[in-house]
Each structure stands twice: as C-alpha cells, then as structure tokens.
Design a protein with these regions (language model features):
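Helix-rich cap/lid subdomain of alpha/beta-hydrolase
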Residues: 1-32, 41-45
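Conserved catalytic core of Hanks-type protein kinase domains
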Residues: 4, 33, 64, 91, ...
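Residues at helix-coil transition
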Residues: 15-18, 35-36, 93, 124
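Conserved serine/cysteine hydrolase catalytic core
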Residues: 24, 35-90, 99
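Catalytic active-site module of serine/aspartate enzymes centered on a nucleophile-bearing elbow/loop
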Residues: 94-125
Length: 125
C-alpha cells in the first residue's frame, strides 16, 4: 500500500480514539511507530490480532489478582466499550472502576487532569 494512503488510514484510526479532536502535533507520536515498512506491517498485524478470544482465554485468571487495581475508562470509548470495563471491574476482586464522561479510548489526551487525579489518589500512601 502506498505510504501516504497507509498514513491517512492510521491517522483516521487513531483520531477515532479521542472524544476531543486531536491536532496533528498530538497525533504524530501516536502514529509514528506504525509508519514505514515495518510500522505498516506491525499496524495491520495488530489490527488482525484484535480478537476477543485472546482476552477471553485469560479472563478466568482475573479473579486471582491480589494487588490493588484501578481501571480508568472513557465513557465514550469507541474502540472498547465501557461494558468491557465494567466486566473487567467485576472480574477483579477489590478493583476500582473510574469512568470519565466525554472521554474516549485515549483518556490521557481527552482528560489528562482527571487521569492525573485518579492516579494521584490511587497511588497516594
């Protein structure tokens, strides 16, 4: 595939991961690893491996987790719906689920202050 078409496809894909439109400067570091011949191959390999069976097979092990877990999820995530975050929360004993309204998959871009606050609270002694 021509590099310019691949780059446009990757950019469109990554832009869909935020609720707030992402500018080109912010987008750059997200798409750079998926550009060039090796990056293009890696991108499509990752897309083809996006199969629930890979997580479904380890899901029974989640109940064994004995460490504190905080799950941060954007309520407008179009890549992995909030329902999956809720299932994960139910499967991990004692976990916390923190959701962010008007936020998609890349919560650190859509709501950096909320993510920082959640992490600060979670990691505080």
């Amino acid at each position: 595939m021509p590099a310019y078409i691949h780059e446009a496809m990757v950019a469109a894909y990554v832009r869909d991961a935020t609720y707030v439109p992402m500018d080109d400067e912010t987008l750059g570091p997200y798409i750079k690893p998926w550009l060039g011949a090796e990056g293009q191959e890696a991108f499509y390999r990752q897309i083809f491996q996006n199969d629930p069976r890979y997580t479904d097979e380890v899901q029974p092990l989640y109940g064994r987790i004995e460490r504190p877990v905080m799950i941060v999820w954007g309520e407008e995530d179009r890549w992995i719906p909030l329902e999956k975050g809720e299932q994960l929360h139910k499967a991990i004993p004692g976990s916390q689920l923190r959701t962010i309204p008007r936020c998609a998959h890349l919560a650190q871009e859509d709501a950096p202050e909320a993510v920082a606050e959640f992490l600060t609270d979670f990691l505080a002694p």
